[in-house]
Structures are given as structure tokens and as C-alpha cells.
Amino acid sequence: MHWGTLCGFLWLWPYLFYVQAVPIQKVQDDTKTLIKTIVTRINDISHTQSVSSKQKVTGLDFIPGLHPILTLSKMDQTLAVYQQILTSMPSRNVIQISNDLENLRDLLHVLAFSKSCHLPWASGLETLDSLGGVLEASGYSTEVVALSRLQGSLQDMLWQLDLSPGC
């Protein structure tokens, strides 16, 4: 028997009962703040201002557009696709944004859990075989369109979070 481990566990036992859960409003506020931070990061990349998020670009149909009604599940799926696209890009401009999307997805999962929703981890697109060719042929355009559409999607998510979206 490992007495040291047992004593250590028994010593920590009272503290485990005093741990308080983070209020869900705090999680929702953190989610909104992170969305605003990501939008600011996108705005700081100067060339993203040149394309409308609603504009159709041939060959870039796999980049999600705007969705009028977003559930937590749809938000997570959309962010998973954007994260997959951004991590495939050679540009260093998008590394922090991709990391922020991962954190945002984690916060969405906490919000879903608080609503007793089972939110499976979305994996993004089934296949991005065409992405490699698109990035080689027009990496700059892909980055501009992806960031512009991501910005629009994030602004929609921010609005939807105020309406307390469903699962």
C-alpha cells in the first residue's frame, strides 16, 4: 500500500468539496470576448477588407458562408471547417486565429454541456483534397475569402449567443 499517496489524497479531499463551478454566464461572456478578439485579429490583417463575405468565388465553395440560424452544433461544425482550412494555409497570419478557434470550440462545448446537449466533436470537412491545389494556385485569395467569411460567421455567432442558441 502506498501510504504517501493515500495521505496526499486524504489531505486534498476537503478542498475538492470547496471547488466552485464557473458560472455559465461567465463562460458565455468569455465566448463573446474571444469572438470579438478573433474578429479584431482578422481586421488587423489588412488584406481581408477587400472581399465581401457574401461574394461567391469559383473553386472556394467549400469555405462556409453565412447561416441565418445557428445552433451550438452548427457553430462547432462551422468552426471546425474554418480551423481545418486555416491550419492548411502556409500563411503565418492565421496561426493565432486557428488556435483561438480551438479555444472557442472548447467554450462552445462547455456551453452545450451546461444545456445538457451532447455535442460531438466536429471534424471539419470530410475531405479537403481540393484544398491543396487551391492553396497552390491561389493561396492569397483563399486566405482572404476564408478570413472574410469567418469574420461574418463569427459576427453571426456573436449575435446568436445573445439569443441563447439551442443544441
Swiss-Prot record:
InterPro entries assigned: 4_helix_cytokine-like_core (IPR009079), Leptin (IPR000065)
Disulfide pairings: C117-C167
Signal sequence region: 1-21
Pfam families: Leptin
Keyword field: Diabetes mellitus, Disease variant, Disulfide bond, Obesity, Secreted, Signal
GO terms, molecular function: DNA binding; hormone activity; leptin receptor binding; peptide hormone receptor binding
Any GO BP: response to activity
GO cellular component: cytosol; extracellular region; extracellular space
Induction: Induced by secretin.
Subcellular compartments: Secreted
Tissues and organs where the protein is expressed, per its UniProt entry: Adipose tissue is the main source of leptin. It is also produced by other peripheral tissues such as the skeletal muscle. Expressed by intercalated and striated tracts of submandibular and parotid salivary gland intralobular ducts. Detected by fundic epithelium of the gastric mucosa. Secreted into blood and gastric juice.
Listed result of changing D100Y: In LEPD; no effect on secretion; does not bind or activate LEPR
UniProt record similarity statement: Belongs to the leptin family.
Disease per UniProt entry: Leptin deficiency: A rare disease characterized by low levels of serum leptin, severe hyperphagia and intractable obesity from an early age.
Role played: Key player in the regulation of energy balance and body weight control. Once released into the circulation, has central and peripheral effects by binding LEPR, found in many tissues, which results in the activation of several major signaling pathways. In the hypothalamus, acts as an appetite-regulating factor that induces a decrease in food intake and an increase in energy consumption by inducing anorexinogenic factors and suppressing orexigenic neuropeptides, also regulates bone mass and secretion of hypothalamo-pituitary-adrenal hormones.
Subunit: Interacts with SIGLEC6.
Name of the molecule in the record: Leptin
